[in-house]
């Protein structure tokens, strides 16, 4: 399969939590900056699940009613001539991300947005993405076909390596699908101590029989 390689790249506490009271403290600046610096050394695309995307990159609430009645087919849509040095891939099966721009500024770069959706996303949402010049890939009916998405990301955008930065659920989904090539962990100099916070991987209780 000619697909983009996947590297899970996570910033976590010593006890393996991906967020908490330690995040953003002065003492985590060096390790946090190192994480950001390494991200685009590892690959040209930063990818996240929809929970992370709506929390950080696409916080808007677009009015989709203006797109009612749009005759849009459930097929990939990529603007003609689209080019970027770096990309921001949103795994967003239901179409939740409220983009206000068609890029996400992160790690000193303007990373052009790409949406990976399923047929659960409304046609109004797809019309909204087209109005924003945000390309989208339809990969599945109910659940995302991750392998298909990686093939399309390479074919359409020449993304050779996709860097997956969480959250825990999307990391676990890629692990369960057997699509992770490498794992990169940057550790902050703090212990979270909060058992309610998510760890780096949520595999839904399944052992992943793969050595990294």
Where are these regions (language model features)?
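Enzymes that bind and transform nitrogen-containing heteroaromatic metabolites
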Residues: 1-212
